C-alpha cells in the first residue's frame, strides 16, 4: 500500500513538473497562411486636415482620375486647393480559406502631408496581391486612435493621427486557390526550431495514431501521413492539434534592444560567480565668448572677442562588486539589480559576462 502511494506521489510530481501544451499552440500547418494585400486610395471628408495638394500632386491626379470615371470633367489647368482629401495606402491580410463575401479589417495610412485622418471616409479601393490581381475591395469610415488640437501656433497631439483602421472594411472578391486536401501528407512547422521538440511531437502522434504516422524531418518540420480528402484531413488535424506534448526547456537567451535600452531574458538564464566593476566617465565641454571693448570710445581702440573653453572630466563608480552564482531567474535579477547599473550599462555588462563565460545564455542584440 505504501509503495503504491509513493509511486502515485512520484507520478503526480513528475506530471506537475512537466509543462504540457497542445500541438496547435506549438506548430502551424505548412501552406495554411495569410497573404498580404495592398492598395492606393483616397480619404475624403477631412475637417481641413487633408493633403496640401500643391505639395502632393499625386493627390490631385488621383482625384481627377476618379472624377473622370464618375463622368465629371475638370477643366485643364484648374488649381484645386483641396484640404479635405488625402492620399493613403491601404493594407490588409487575406486569411487562409477566405471566401467571397467575407469581410476583413484594413489599415489606412497617410502617404502625403495630411495632418490627420480623423473623421475621414475611405473611398472604394481595390486591394491587390503580389500577382497584381484584385482580391478585395475596401471602403468605410476610418477609426483613428489619436487626438489632437492646434490654435495660435500651439498644438497638442496624443498618439498617431495619420493612420487608422476600418473594422470589416474590405470584402473578399476573389478566393485564393488552396492545396489543402490534395495528397496524403501534411507538414507541421514548429514556431521555434527545436530538434527534441520536433521528435517529441512525432513520437506523440505515433503513439496515438500508430507507428509511421509522423516523422520529424528537421528541427522545424514534422511530416504527418493523413487520409485523402478535405473532410478526412480536417478531422485528422483536429485530433492531432489537441494532443498534449510535454514542453522541453527552452534555450537560455538574453535579448537586448540597443535602440530602446531594454533587456529581456527567459527563465533558463543562469549566472556563474564573477566580479564586475563598472565606472561612469563623463566629459563636459563649456565654451564661452569674452568680449573686450576699449574704455575710451573715441581713442581708436578695437573690440576683441576671445573664446574661452573649459573641459571637465569626471569618473564615478568603478568599485569591484561580486556577483554570486544564480540558478534561477529571480536570483539572476537580484544579482544584476545589486550592481545598480542602468539598462544601458547593463547591456555592456552582460556582453562582458558572456565573453568571460559567466553568463550561461545566448546573447541576441536586435
UniProtKB/Swiss-Prot annotation:
Subcellular location(s) of the protein: Periplasm; Bacterial flagellum basal body
Pfam families: FlgI (PF02119)
Residues making up the signal peptide according to the UniProt record: 1-20
Protein name: Flagellar P-ring protein
Cited NCBIfam families: PRK05303.1
Organism: Escherichia coli (strain UTI89 / UPEC)
This protein's GO CC annotations: bacterial-type flagellum basal body, distal rod, P ring; outer membrane-bounded periplasmic space
Keyword Signal in record: yes
Amino acid at each position: 500500500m505504501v509503495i503504491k502511494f509513493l509511486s502515485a506521489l512520484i507520478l503526480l510530481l513528475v506530471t506537475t513538473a512537466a509543462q504540457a501544451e497542445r500541438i496547435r499552440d506549438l506548430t502551424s500547418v505548412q501552406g495554411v497562411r495569410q497573404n498580404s494585400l495592398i492598395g492606393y486610395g483616397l480619404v475624403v471628408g477631412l475637417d481641413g486636415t487633408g493633403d496640401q495638394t500643391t505639395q502632393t500632386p499625386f493627390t490631385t491626379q488621383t482625384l481627377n482620375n476618379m472624377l473622370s470615371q464618375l463622368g465629371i470633367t475638370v477643366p485643364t489647368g484648374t488649381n484645386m486647393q483641396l484640404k479635405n482629401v488625402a492620399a493613403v495606402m491601404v493594407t490588409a491580410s487575406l486569411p487562409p480559406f477566405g471566401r467571397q463575401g467575407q469581410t476583413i479589417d484594413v489599415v489606412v495610412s497617410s502617404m502625403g502631408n495630411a495632418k490627420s485622418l480623423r473623421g475621414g471616409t475611405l473611398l472604394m479601393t481595390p486591394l491587390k496581391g503580389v500577382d497584381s490581381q484584385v482580391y478585395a475591395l475596401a471602403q468605410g469610415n476610418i477609426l483613428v486612435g489619436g487626438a489632437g488640437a492646434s490654435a495660435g501656433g500651439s498644438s497638442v497631439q496624443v498618439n498617431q493621427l495619420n493612420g487608422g483602421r476600418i473594422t470589416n472594411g474590405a470584402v473578399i472578391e476573389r478566393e485564393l486557390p488552396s492545396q489543402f486536401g490534395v495528397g496524403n501528407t501534411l507538414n507541421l512547422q514548429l514556431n521555434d526550431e527545436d530538434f527534441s521538440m520536433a521528435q517529441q511531437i512525432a513520437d506523440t502522434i505515433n503513439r496515438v495514431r500508430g507507428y509511421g504516422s509522423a516523422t520529424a524531418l528537421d528541427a522545424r518540420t514534422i511530416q504527418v501521413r493523413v487520409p485523402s480528402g478535405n473532410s478526412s484531413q480536417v478531422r485528422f488535424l483536429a485530433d492531432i492539434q489537441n494532443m498534449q506534448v510535454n514542453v522541453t526547456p527552452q534555450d537560455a537567451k538574453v535579448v537586448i534592444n540597443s535602440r530602446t535600452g531594454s533587456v529581456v531574458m527567459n527563465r533558463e538564464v543562469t549566472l556563474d560567480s564573477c566580479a564586475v566593476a563598472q565606472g561612469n566617465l563623463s566629459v563636459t565641454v563649456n565654451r564661452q565668448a569674452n568680449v573686450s571693448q576699449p574704455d575710451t570710445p573715441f581713442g581708436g581702440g578695437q573690440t576683441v572677442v576671445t573664446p574661452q573653453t573649459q573641459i571637465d572630466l569626471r569618473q564615478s563608480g568603478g568599485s569591484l562588486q561580486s556577483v554570486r552564482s544564480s540558478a534561477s531567474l529571480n536570483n539572476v535579477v537580484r544579482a544584476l539589480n545589486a550592481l545598480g547599473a542602468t539598462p544601458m550599462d547593463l547591456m555592456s555588462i552582460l556582453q562582458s559576462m558572456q565573453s568571460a563565460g559567466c553568463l550561461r545564455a545566448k546573447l541576441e542584440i536586435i
